[in-house]
């Protein structure tokens, strides 16, 4: 909703004083102060729907627990839960305008949620916005809570949602590489180490390799994400549970499990957990691992597709757009390039998360807001990058089979396949002569009478060079 449609206002007060709030706004005075104090990054909470979902779930669970303890009336509990339910349905997200990067260890975000939920609950109860004597952002929505347990719990829940959102996009990219691996399984090409000719392989093995190294990362992401299911709800300010009644933490955890269906658990040491943001550090690191491999893959895609006439040219990437404002006909590998840049950004975010993670002091880490922003942003970047690379690059790759085969036939690297039969010393002599004369390894072996044509064809057949084999040929060393 547009909070400036009528120009009408209401008056709300806090510790600092009284302020006019747009009458249509569900948020209140503390959110307004947060807007004014932290116009920093343009990353608004409203742009992070799964974080907002985490906040709503956290507040809903707290209301359920507080009602069981007799701290809320039925009317207050029902209204708070209904307001949270509307937020979970995607409503009122425009009422979360605060900057993700903020001072105060997340208090602005927590109060934004408290105020929106309280004012919507008031409406559902038949009262006016701002009539907090009936349902207060602090006394009722935030009952038994501190920012220091509600905010990180909401981050954990939101990030676990993001993790579940990320995995299918990575799996689809892996499947695309696997499909190309199968399609190119019979295309022989040269492998390379240190950018130099090595030994033959298939183009399919290259793409299956891409798929396999990414597949390994799913387990690492799952392992890192599991830490999000351990929360400090009930810790309140510093982990001692001040202002929370006995049994509140356990009831809140039970409510969180009921709402989400996840195996959410209470930290075994709430004091330690309240200052510990290592789960964000761990997940950011897991995303960095993915990016290290994505950079390798995208660099390979760009190199192996280089050309079209004067590069390696083993395959063609789909032409997506003209590549130059001055060079006619030039087409660039824009999809791998943008994935490279996404990887750099995510790796930069990981460094930010690491530095903020080590900034914890005493019983709290006040730098958690930037850690949350970086992690949520990184997941979004990876999702967009994976989809772009898959649909606008990998799915449309076309192999240049003749070019790949020609490279193998003209490569000196095939001499390695002769090692078991003619020995390393003789193979070295052949390689040196081939390099000096330009004559193929195949022809030189025949010219010197080292092997018969039948023996040579057996050794250098594609199927015998791309996997371990036992050759029935007598060594000539």
Where are the language model's segments positioned?
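Conserved, well-structured ligand/cofactor-binding cores
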Residues: 1-477
């Amino acid at each position: 909703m547009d909070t400036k449609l009528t120009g009408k206002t209401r008056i709300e007060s806090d510790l600092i004083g009284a302020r006019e709030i747009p009458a249509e706004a569900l948020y209140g005075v503390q959110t307004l102060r947060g807007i004014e104090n932290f116009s920093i990054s343009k990353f608004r909470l409203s742009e992070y729907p799964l974080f907002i979902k985490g906040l709503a779930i956290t507040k809903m669970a707290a209301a359920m627990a507080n009602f069981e303890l007799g701290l809320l009336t039925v009317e207050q509990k029902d209204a708070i839960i209904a307001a949270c339910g509307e937020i979970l349905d995607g409503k009122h997200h425009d009422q979360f305008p605060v900057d993700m990067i903020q001072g105060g260890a997340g208090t602005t975000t927590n109060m934004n949620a408290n105020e929106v939920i309280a004012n919507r609950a008031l409406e559902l109860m038949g009262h006016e916005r701002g009539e907090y004597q009936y349902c207060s952002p602090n006394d009722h929505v935030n009952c038994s809570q501190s920012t220091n347990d509600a905010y990180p719990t909401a981050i954990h829940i939101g990030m676990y949602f993001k993790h579940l959102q990320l995995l299918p996009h990575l799996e689809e990219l892996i499947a695309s590489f696997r499909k190309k691996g199968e399609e190119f399984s019979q295309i022989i090409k040269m492998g390379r180490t240190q950018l130099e000719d090595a030994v033959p392989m298939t183009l399919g093995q290259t793409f299956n390799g891409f798929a396999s190294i990414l597949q390994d990362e799913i387990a690492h992401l799952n392992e890192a994400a599991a830490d999000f299911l351990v929360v400090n709800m009930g810790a309140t300010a510093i982990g001692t549970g001040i202002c929370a009644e006995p049994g509140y933490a356990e009831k809140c955890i039970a409510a969180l499990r009921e709402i989400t269906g996840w195996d959410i658990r209470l930290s075994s040491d709430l004091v330690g957990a309240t200052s510990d943001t290592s789960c964000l550090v761990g997940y950011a690191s897991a995303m960095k691992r993915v990016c290290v491999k994505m950079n390798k893959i995208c660099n390979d895609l760009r190199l192996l597709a280089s050309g079209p006439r004067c590069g390696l040219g083993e395959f063609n990437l789909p032409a997506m757009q003209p590549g130059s404002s001055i060079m006619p006909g030039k087409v660039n590998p824009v999809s791998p390039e943008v994935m490279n840049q996404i990887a750099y950004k995510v790796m930069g975010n990981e460094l930010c998360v690491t530095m903020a993670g080590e900034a914890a002091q005493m019983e709290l880490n006040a730098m958690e807001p930037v850690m949350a922003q970086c992690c949520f942003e990184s997941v979004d970047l990876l999702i967009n990058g994976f989809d772009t690379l898959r649909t606008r690059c990998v799915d449309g790759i076309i192999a240049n089979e003749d070019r790949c085969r020609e490279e193998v036939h003209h490569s000196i690297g095939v001499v390695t396949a002769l090692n078991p039969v003619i020995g390393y010393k003789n193979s070295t002599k052949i390689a040196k002569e081939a390099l000096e004369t330009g004559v193929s390894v195949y022809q030189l072996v025949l010219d010197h009478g080292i092997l018969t044509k039948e023996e040579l064809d057996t050794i250098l057949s594609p199927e015998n060079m791309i996997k371990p084999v036992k050759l029935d040929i007598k060594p000539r060393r």
